C-alpha cells in the first residue's frame, strides 16, 4: 500500500543539474545544494492521511546528483544522466494525485515482493527509473494492477532519487522528469549478463578524476545508515551503447500483477505565442498569488517561484504542472485530464479552471476559520473581562463572591424557619465546608445542592387549618354527591383537631371501584380543611428511591417524593394523596417500595422520617395521608394494617342521575358554552344511558357519554349557524356590487336568530343519534332460568354484577354402570372457587341423600359446571350457596324460583358464612331486576347501613344454614 507525499522543485533550466559534480562547480554552490538536500531529507514525509507539499526556498533547483548516498555496490559518485528514451520501466500504481514532471513524491512498497525485487535489481543495475500511473479506482489499495485498464494511460517517467530499504518496506522518493504513455504490459526478463552501467567505466572515471586540474570536494557523509540515495547520470552516448534489449514475451499478468510496462514519451504540441496564451498564464499566476493569501504556509516559497525573474511566464508547461500540484480540492479525473492533454492552450484553460476552484474553496475555508477564530476570541475576551469585572467589584465591595452570596441566601432562609437543633448543626457544618471548596469542583456543587434542599424544608411552618364544621361540610357537599362514610370521617377528623386545639395527621385509605370519586374527593377534603394539596401516584413504582430519595453521593441524586412535596407546599401539614397504592410494584433490584411506605405511613415512625438524601429526620406527623385503591386484597398486609380503610362503594342508578344533574352536566355546560336553552337532556334519557350504556359502579363512563352528547349538540348548532350566515353573506355581497338594488330586510337575520335559539332535546327516542347503539340490550342472561341455572351475585373491582352458574349433564345418567360419576368446571375459575365446587358437591350430596335416599344421581352423573364470561377470571368463596343450589336443581330436575339471587360462602356442614361487597351486590340485584335476595345472616349489619331507597323493592332473606335457603328454593 502506498503512502505518498510531494516536494515541489523547479523544473526550469534542468540542464544545469548535470554539472553538479563537475570540477567547474564552485564549492559555495555545492555546499548550498548539499544544505538543500539536508533540508529535503529532514522533512517528515506524509503518510496515508493525504499529501503534504514542500517547496524549495532558493532560486537554483536542487541538484539530484549532489552528495547522494548510493548502495554500497554502486561504487563512487559517478553521475548518471537521465535517459531521454527508456521504453521499458517498472510500473508503480498510485492513488488520487498524479505526479507531474518537475515534482517529487514519496511512495512506499509494502506488500508486493516481486515489485520490491524488481526495484532492488534496477537499483543494482544503476537504472533507478520507473513509471508512475494513477489508478482509476481510489478505493483500490493494491500495489500492483492486473490490467492496464485499471490505471489512466498517461503517467510520469520518474527517477528514484532516494531509497530507504527496511526489508519489509521499501521507501522511495521519486522525481518526475517527463510524461509517458503506457502501451502494454511486458514480462520481466533478467538479462544473462547483468553488468552495471558504470562498471566498465569505473577505472577510466577514477583516472580522469585523478588527472583533473580542479578536484571536486569530497562527498558528504551519509545521513543515515539505512538510507541509500540514487541519483545516477549517464551521458547520451553511453545510454545509446547500453540500451536494454526489449523482452520477447508480452501480455497482461493476471495472477502476479503487472510490474513492468512498455511506454512511449508524450510530446506536447508547440506553445502558441499569442496574447490569449499570455493572458491565460498571467491570470493563472495572479490566481495562484490569491490562493497563497488564504494559505500562508507556503506563501514565501510560491512567491519566489512566481517572481518575474524566474521567467515562469515563458514556461506554460511547467506552470500547468505547478497548478496541478498546488490544488488540493480537485478530483482525480480533472487532474488526469491535464496530464493527458497535449495541447498547451487547452492545458492552460484546464489549469485556470482548477486554480479558480481552488481559490473558491480556499476562500471559503479561510472565512470559516476566521469566523471560528473570531468567536473563540470574543468568548475568551468576554471571559477575561468578566473575570476582571468580578475582581474589580470585589475590591470595591460592590459585589461579593459566589460563596458569600450562597451562604447569605441560606442564612436568610433560616431566619424565617424554626429549624431543629440537629438540622441546624448539619447546616452549619455544610456551610463551613462550602467556604473551603473550590467553586469549580464537583464537591462544591454537591454541597450547595444539599444546602439548598436542606433549607427548602418548611421547618416549623404550618398553614392555618379550617375548624368550622359547617364550612367543611359545605365544601364537601359541593364537590361530591353521596359518599356519606368519607364525609363523616372527615368531619370527625376536624372535630378531634378542634377539641385538641392542635393540628394532627392521619392515614386513611379510600377503596372502591374506579370512577366513584376517590381521587377527586381528596382535593375537596384539602379545600375543606384549608390544607395544601399534593398528589403522587405509586402505581407501577419499583424504585425505593422514589419515596426515600437517593444517597447524595450519587450523580444526579434527588430526595424522595415527600421531601419534594414539603418543598413545594412550604408547610408541614399538607394533604398528601398517594394514588393507586394497590398497584405498587413488587420487590426487585431497586428494593421494595411497599416496604418503604411502611415508615412513611406509620404514625409511630413518620415523626422522624429519614430521607436518604437529607439524612436528617423530618417530622411528617402533621401530614394527612389519603391513599386510594381498587382492591384492598392486593395491598400488602403490614401496609394495610397501618391505614384506616374507608369503603367508597359504587352508585345506584338514582344516584348517578343526581350526580349527572348536580355535577357532570353543569361542568360540561361551562366547558362547551351550551346553555340550558340550547340543550336539554331528559331524565328518561339519563336513565336509559345508565341502564344500557353505563352499568359500571362509577360515573367516569357516564361522564364520557354525556360529554359525547354535548359535542354532537355543539356540532349541530354550529352547522346550523353557518348555514344561516352564508345566505346573509351572499346578500351583503350582492348589495355591495349593485348599489341600485333594494335595501336588505331584517327577515333573514330574525330567522337566523330563531334557528340558533331552537333547543335540542335529548330523550330516549333520539339517544342513539348521539351515543350510538346500546352496549347492553338485556339486564339478565336468562329471563326464565331452567333447571341447573342459578343467578348469583359477584363483587369485582368494577362493582357488583350478576353471576350465573350453569350446571348440566354431560350424558344421561346410567345407574347400571359400575363407574362413578365425575364433575368438570370451566369459566376461568380460580383455586378458591374450584374448592367451593367440591365443597358444594359434598353438601348437595348430603341434602339429596336426606331428602331422597334412593336417588343415586350424584353417584353416577357426569356433571359439567360452567360460569359464563370465561375471559374474565373468577375467584372467591361467595358462590358456595349458588353452586349447591345449582347442583340440587339439576339433580331434582326442577327450576328454582324466578327472579331470585343469592350469595354466601358454604361450609362443609352447610353453614352459610359472611361475604363482602354487600352494597355492590345489592346494587347489582336491583339492576338486573331480582326480587328476592338471599344473604348470609352475619351480613345483616352491612345491609342495615344501606339507604332506605336501596332496600326498597327487594325481598331480602337472611340465612344462617343452607336448610333455611332450601326451604324457599323451589316454592
Swiss-Prot record:
Residue intervals of the Lon N-terminal domain: 89-359
Record GO cellular component, one term: mitochondrial matrix
Disruption phenotype: RNAi-mediated knockdown causes transcription factor atfs-1 accumulation in mitochondria.
One annotated GO biological process: cellular response to oxidative stress
Entry EC no(s): 3.4.21.53
A GO term for molecular function: ATP hydrolysis activity
Record's catalysed reaction(s): Hydrolysis of proteins in presence of ATP
Pfam family, one: Lon_C
Subcellular location per the Swiss-Prot or TrEMBL entry: Mitochondrion matrix
Domain Lon proteolytic: 784-971
Lineage: Eukaryota, Metazoa, Ecdysozoa, Nematoda, Chromadorea
Region: Disordered, residue numbers: 190-255, 718-749
Alphabetical UniProt keywords: ATP-binding, DNA-binding, Hydrolase, Mitochondrion, Nucleotide-binding, Protease, Serine protease, Transit peptide
Transit peptide residues according to the UniProt entry: 1-55
Subunit structure: Homohexamer or homoheptamer. Organized in a ring with a central cavity.
Entry similarity comment: Belongs to the peptidase S16 family.
Chief location category: mitochondrion
Enzyme kind, highest EC tier: hydrolase
Name of the featured protein: Lon protease homolog, mitochondrial
Compositional bias (Polar residues): 733-749
Species assigned in the record: Caenorhabditis elegans
Superkingdom of this protein's organism: Eukaryota
CDD domains membership: RecA-like_Lon
Amino acid at each position: 500500500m502506498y503512502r505518498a507525499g510531494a516536494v515541489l522543485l523547479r523544473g526550469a533550466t534542468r540542464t544545469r543539474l548535470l554539472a553538479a559534480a563537475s570540477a567547474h562547480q564552485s564549492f559555495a554552490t555545492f555546499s548550498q545544494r548539499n544544505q538543500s538536500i539536508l533540508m529535503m531529507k529532514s522533512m517528515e514525509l506524509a503518510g496515508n492521511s493525504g499529501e503534504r507539499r514542500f517547496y524549495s526556498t532558493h532560486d537554483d533547483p536542487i541538484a539530484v546528483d549532489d552528495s547522494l548516498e548510493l548502495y554500497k555496490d554502486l561504487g563512487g559518485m559517478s553521475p548518471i544522466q537521465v535517459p531521454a528514451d527508456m521504453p521499458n520501466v517498472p510500473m508503480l500504481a498510485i492513488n488520487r494525485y498524479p505526479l507531474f514532471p518537475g515534482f517529487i513524491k514519496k511512495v512506499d512498497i509494502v506488500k508486493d515482493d516481486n515489485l520490491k525485487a524488481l526495484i532492488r535489481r534496477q537499483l543494482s543495475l544503476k537504472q533507478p527509473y520507473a513509471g508512475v500511473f494513477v489508478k482509476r479506482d481510489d478505493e483500490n489499495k493494491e500495489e500492483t494492477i492486473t490490467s492496464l485498464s485499471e490505471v489512466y494511460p498517461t503517467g510520469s517517467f520518474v527517477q528514484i532519487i532516494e531509497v530507504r530499504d527496511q526489508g519489509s518496506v521499501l521507501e522511495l522518493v521519486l522525481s518526475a522528469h517527463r510524461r509517458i504513455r503506457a502501451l502494454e504490459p511486458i514480462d520481466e526478463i533478467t538479462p544473462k549478463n547483468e553488468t552495471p552501467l558504470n562498471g566498465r567505466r569505473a577505472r577510466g572515471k577514477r583516472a580522469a578524476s585523478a588527472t583533473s586540474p580542479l578536484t571536486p570536494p569530497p562527498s558528504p557523509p551519509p545521513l543515515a545508515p539505512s538510507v541509500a540515495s540514487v541519483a545516477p547520470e549517464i551521458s547520451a552516448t553511453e545510454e545509446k551503447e547500453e540500451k536494454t534489449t526489449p523482452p520477447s514475451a508480452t501480455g497482461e499478468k493476471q495472477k502476479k500483477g503487472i510490474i513492468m510496462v512498455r511506454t512511449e514519451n508524450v510530446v506536447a504540441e508547440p506553445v502558441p505565442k499569442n496574447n490569449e496564451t499570455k493572458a491565460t498564464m498571467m491570470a493563472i499566476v495572479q490566481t495562484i498569488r490569491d490562493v497563497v493569501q488564504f494559505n500562508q504556509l507556503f506563501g514565501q516559497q510560491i512567491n519566489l517561484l512566481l517572481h518575474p525573474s524566474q521567467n515562469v511566464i515563458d514556461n506554460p508547461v511547467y506552470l500547468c504542472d505547478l497548478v496541478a500540484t498546488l490544488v488540493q480540492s480537485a478530483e482525480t479525473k480533472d487532474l488526469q485530464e491535464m496530464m493527458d492533454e497535449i495541447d498547451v492552450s487547452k492545458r492552460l484553460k484546464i489549469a485556470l479552471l482548477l486554480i479558480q476552484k481552488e481559490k473558491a474553496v480556499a476562500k471559503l475555508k479561510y472565512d470559516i476559520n476566521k469566523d471560528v477564530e473570531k468567536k473563540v476570541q470574543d468568548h475568551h475576551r468576554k471571559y477575561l473581562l468578566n473575570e476582571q469585572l468580578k475582581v474589580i467589584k470585589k475590591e470595591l465591595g460592590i459585589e461579593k463572591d459566589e460563596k458569600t452570596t450562597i451562604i447569605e441566601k441560606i442564612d436568610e432562609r433560616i431566619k424565617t424557619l424554626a429549624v431543629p437543633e440537629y438540622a441546624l448543626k448539619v447546616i452549619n457544618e455544610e456551610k463551613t465546608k462550602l467556604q473551603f471548596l473550590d467553586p469549580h469542583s464537583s464537591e462544591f456543587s454537591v454541597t450547595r445542592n444539599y444546602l439548598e434542599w436542606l433549607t427548602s424544608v418548611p421547618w416549623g411552618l404550618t398553614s392555618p387549618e379550617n375548624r368550622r364544621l359547617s364550612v367543611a361540610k359545605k365544601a364537601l357537599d359541593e364537590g361530591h354527591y353521596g359518599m356519606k362514610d368519607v364525609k363523616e370521617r372527615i368531619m370527625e377528623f376536624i372535630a378531634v383537631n378542634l377539641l385538641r386545639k392542635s393540628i394532627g395527621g392521619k392515614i386513611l385509605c379510600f377503596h372502591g371501584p374506579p370512577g366513584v370519586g376517590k381521587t377527586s374527593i381528596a382535593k375537596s377534603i384539602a379545600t375543606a380543611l384549608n390544607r395544601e394539596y399534593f398528589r403522587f401516584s405509586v402505581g407501577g413504582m419499583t424504585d425505593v428511591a422514589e419515596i426515600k430519595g437517593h444517597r447524595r453521593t450519587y450523580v444526579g441524586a434527588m430526595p424522595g417524593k415527600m421531601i419534594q412535596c414539603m418543598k413545594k407546599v412550604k408547610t408541614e401539614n399538607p394533604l398528601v394523596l398517594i394514588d393507586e397504592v394497590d398497584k405498587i410494584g413488587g420487590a426487585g433490584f431497586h428494593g421494595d417500595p411497599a416496604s418503604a411506605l411502611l415508615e412513611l405511613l406509620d404514625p409511630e415512625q413518620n415523626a422522624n422520617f429519614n430521607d436518604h438524601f437529607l439524612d436528617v429526620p423530618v417530622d411528617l406527623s402533621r401530614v394527612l395521608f389519603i391513599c386510594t385503591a381498587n382492591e384492598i386484597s392486593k395491598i400488602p398486609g403490614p401496609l394495610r394494617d397501618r391505614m384506616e380503610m374507608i369503603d367508597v362503594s359504587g352508585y345506584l342508578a338514582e344516584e348517578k342521575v343526581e350526580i349527572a344533574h348536580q355535577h357532570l352536566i353543569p361542568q360540561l355546560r361551562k366547558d362547551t358554552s351550551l346553555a340550558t336553552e340550547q340543550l336539554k337532556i331528559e331524565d328518561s334519557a339519563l336513565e336509559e344511558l345508565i341502564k344500557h350504556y353505563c352499568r359500571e359502579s362509577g360515573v367516569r363512563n357516564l361522564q364520557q357519554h354525556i360529554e359525547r352528547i354535548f359535542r354532537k349538540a355543539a356540532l349541530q348548532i354550529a352547522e346550523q349557524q353557518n348555514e344561516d350566515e352564508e345566505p346573509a353573506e351572499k346578500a351583503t355581497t350582492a348589495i355591495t356590487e349593485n348599489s341600485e338594488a333594494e335595501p336588505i330586510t331584517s327577515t333573514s337575520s330574525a330567522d337566523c336568530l330563531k334557528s340558533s335559539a331552537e333547543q335540542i332535546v335529548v330523550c330516549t327516542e333520539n339517544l342513539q343519534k348521539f351515543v350510538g347503539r346500546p352496549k347492553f340490550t338485556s339486564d339478565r342472561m336468562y329471563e326464565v332460568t331452567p333447571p341447573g341455572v342459578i343467578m348469583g351475585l359477584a363483587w369485582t373491582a368494577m362493582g357488583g354484577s350478576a353471576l350465573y352458574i350453569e350446571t348440566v349433564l354431560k350424558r344421561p345418567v346410567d345407574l347400571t354402570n359400575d363407574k362413578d360419576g365425575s364433575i368438570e368446571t370451566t369459566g376461568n375459575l380460580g383455586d378458591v372457587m374450584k374448592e367451593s365446587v367440591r365443597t358444594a358437591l359434598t353438601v348437595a350430596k348430603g341434602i339429596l341423600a336426606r331428602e331422597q335416599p334412593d336417588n343415586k344421581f350424584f353417584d353416577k352423573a357426569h356433571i359439567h359446571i360452567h360460569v359464563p364470561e370465561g375471559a374474565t377470571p373468577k375467584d372467591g368463596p361467595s358462590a358456595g350457596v349458588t353452586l349447591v343450589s345449582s347442583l340440587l336443581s339439576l339433580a331434582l330436575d326442577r327450576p328454582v324460583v324466578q327472579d331470585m339471587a343469592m350469595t354466601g360462602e358454604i361450609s362443609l356442614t352447610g353453614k352459610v358464612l359472611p361475604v363482602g361487597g354487600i352494597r355492590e351486590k345489592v346494587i347489582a340485584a336491583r339492576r338486573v331486576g331480582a326480587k328476592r335476595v338471599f344473604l348470609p345472616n352475619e351480613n345483616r349489619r352491612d345491609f342495615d347501613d344501606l339507604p332506605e331507597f336501596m332496600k326498597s323493592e327487594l325481598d331480602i332473606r337472611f340465612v344462617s344454614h343452607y336448610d333455611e335457603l332450601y326451604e324457599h328454593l323451589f316454592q
